[in-house]
């Protein structure tokens, strides 16, 4: 008779399955399924590595010119992404956010679902954005140094981590179909935040007017923002009526 006991090597064990879900969702999946779909106000966050595709193209050219095998050099990009995903997962969890999914070199997450006092959410979400931005620089430098020392190559393309944040309403919950189901957030505000991420450049943290207005109302607010007028040639698709966004540029040192 076959042994059906679950072991640590079983890909369907609880421990292994937990790697495919955000920790909060995995721990509360039964309750979330019973809750169905609900409207929630959340801080939506998208991260993306700017110019990552350009870096990949640059390395492909290098491989064709100088190397017979492309595996090793692209393994270094794999390790860079692994460190980035790991740091993002830790960062989001520690700030009580939910990591919805990795989207290539991008990340979709949201903050506020677990909080009763929403005022605390702002500092956690913005703090997560700043911390991940800072730590990504260390991750980037580590792996670019290896590319240089092991392969004698320093890429021309400079990658950075950009971020978009928006305060809005989403439809969050258990979305079912016979072939595949998912616990996620959808809605117009999610799409809008995704457009903001497309607007951001290099290592910018760009936020919506809605989030900026909310930050201004917080007691003892320490976050500094800069108003940005959207150029005509960079209008947000489907949201052309939006004239301004804001860039988070730091904290008030007086506090």
Tell me what each language-model feature is:
Residues 81-87, 128-136, 192-198:
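Substrate-engagement module of ASCE P-loop NTPases
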Residues 1-31, 39-40, 160, 171, ...:
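Intrinsically disordered, glycine/charged-rich C-terminal tails and inter-domain linkers
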Residues 57-59, 176-178, 219:
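Short amphipathic alpha-helical segments
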Residues 46, 164, 205-206:
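Short aromatic/basic micro-patch
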Residues 15-127:
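Catalytic NTP-binding/metal-coordinating core of nucleotidyl cyclase/transferase enzymes
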Residues 91-124, 139-186:
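Catalytic core of nucleotidyl cyclases, primarily class III adenylyl/guanylyl cyclases
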């Amino acid at each position: 008779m076959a042994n059906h006991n679950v072991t640590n090597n079983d890909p369907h064990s609880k421990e292994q399955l937990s790697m495919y879900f955000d920790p909060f969702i995995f721990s509360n999946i039964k309750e979330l399924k019973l809750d169905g779909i609900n409207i929630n106000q959340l801080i939506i966050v998208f991260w993306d590595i700017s110019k990552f595709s350009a870096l990949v193209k640059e390395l492909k050219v290098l491989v064709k010119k100088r190397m017979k095998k492309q595996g090793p050099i692209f393994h270094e990009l794999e390790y860079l992404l692994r460190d980035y995903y790991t740091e993002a997962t830790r960062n989001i969890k520690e700030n009580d956010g939910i990591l919805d999914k990795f989207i290539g070199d991008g990340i979709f997450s949201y903050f506020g679902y677990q909080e009763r006092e929403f005022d605390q959410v702002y500092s956690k979400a913005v703090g997560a954005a700043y911390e991940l931005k800072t730590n990504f620089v260390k991750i980037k430098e580590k792996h670019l140094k290896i590319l240089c020392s092991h392969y004698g190559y320093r890429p021309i393309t400079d990658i950075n981590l950009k971020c978009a944040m928006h305060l809005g309403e989403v439809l969050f919950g258990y979305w079912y179909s016979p072939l595949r189901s998912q616990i996620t957030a959808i809605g117009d505000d999610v799409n809008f935040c995704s457009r903001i991420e497309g607007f951001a450049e290099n290592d910018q943290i760009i936020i919506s007017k809605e989030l900026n207005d909310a930050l201004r109302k917080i007691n003892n607010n320490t976050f500094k923002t800069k108003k940005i007028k959207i150029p005509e040639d960079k209008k947000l698709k489907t949201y052309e009526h939006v004239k301004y966004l804001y860039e988070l540029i730091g904290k008030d040192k007086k506090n």
